[in-house]
Each structure stands twice: as C-alpha cells, then as structure tokens.
Design a protein with these regions (language model features):
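Intrinsically disordered, low-complexity terminal/linker regions enriched in Pro/Ser/Gly
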Residues: 2, 149-176
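Solvent-exposed edge beta-strands and adjacent loop segments
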Residues: 2-78, 118-135, 164, 175-176
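Short, surface-exposed beta-strand/loop "edge" segments at domain boundaries and coil↔beta transitions
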Residues: 24-29, 79-80, 105-115, 147
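Residue-level recognition of well-ordered beta-strand positions that form the cores
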Residues: 70-74, 103, 138-142
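Short, acidic/charged, Gly/Pro-enriched secondary-structure junctions
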Residues: 85-113
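Short, intrinsically disordered/low-complexity patches at protein termini
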Residues: 93-95, 136-139
C-alpha cells in the first residue's frame, strides 16, 4: 500500500488531445502555445449559496452545463485555419450545421471533457510583431460533461472511495 507521498504523478502537455468533429470533418488540434494553452470553465456554477438577511441559508441548484473552452494556439498553427473556416461556415449557414462536438482528454491522466454541441464564439484577437504571437479561441459548449481527475496511481483509500461512489476505475490507475 503506497502512501500518497510515494506516488509520482506524470503530466505531459504533448499527450493532451483536443479533437473537434461533425458530419463533415474531424480534426485534432495542434500547435498549442507555450504556457497555458487550454482552459475549461462552466458558465453557471452547478450550485450557489443563498443567505438571507436573517442568516438563513438555501442552495440554488442549476442544470445549465454551458461551458467555455479556451484554446490558445501559436500563430503558425494550421489549426487556426480549421477553426477560422469552421467559424466562417457557421456564420454563413446560421443553422447549426457547422457546430461540432469537442473532446479534451489528458492522455497521461484521468481528466476528460466532452460536449456534443459546440461552436466558435468569435475570431481571436490577432497581433503581429517580431516574435510569434498567440491566438486564443473561445469555443462555446452547449452541454459539457466533464471529469477533472489526477495524473498518478490512486492510493488504496482513494480507490475504495471511488468504488463506493459507483466509479469503475481503469485498472492502470489502481493501487500498485
């Protein structure tokens, strides 16, 4: 039984996969910028606390899973062309035909994000100078299912807890 201090987690940015696809195309995004190149955020929290003036409390629960995935690419990335064209096609048809599904998967960990309906919100701000610049793409997701997980083997305690919560753990993450 390994203690949490004895577990070495591993993360590799080269193993993060972002794929967009619909009935017309499938594309694995490449050309990530240096530094933070993807962020995932829900637009409305799943629950918020309400406190009355007499210090009574309630919780507001929301089912809205609308989310934003921000992908930052360097300007030389060919994925800029794909995302630009997807936006152009979506703007020209204006009927959702060019919406796509999106998958973000950490290949060295357990994090996984998926939306069956997403679209490019806007063109990124473009700057040009003596250095390579970046392009930040906002991808709006209608309903995002997400699992934010770790990147190392699980301890016995975490493994048992996840099983008690009804999670089937991939054997590669089971305690050694």
């Amino acid at each position: 039984m390994a203690a949490v201090q004895e577990i070495l987690g591993t993360y590799s940015p080269e193993d993060l996969i972002i794929t967009i696809s619909n009935q017309f195309f499938s594309h694995s995004i490449t050309g990530y910028a240096d530094g933070t190149f993807v962020s995932v955020a829900r637009q409305v929290p799943p629950s918020t606390l309400y406190t009355g003036s007499d210090n009574t409390n309630a919780r507001v629960v929301r089912a809205n899973k609308g989310s934003t995935i921000k992908v930052t690419l360097h300007q030389a990335s060919e994925s800029n062309d794909i995302l630009s064209q997807a936006l152009i096609m979506d703007e020209s048809t204006r009927d959702g035909t060019w919406c796509f599904n999106i998958l973000v998967k950490d290949g060295t960990g357990r994090s996984l994000y998926f939306s069956p309906q997403a679209f490019i919100a806007n063109n990124p701000e473009s700057t040009f100078g003596a250095e390579i610049s970046t392009r930040e793409w906002d991808i709006q997701c209608v309903s995002l299912s997400n699992f934010t997980g770790g990147n190392g083997k699980l301890t016995d305690d975490a493994y048992r807890t996840l099983q008690a919560m009804g999670v089937t753990v991939d054997p590669r993450w089971a305690p050694a």
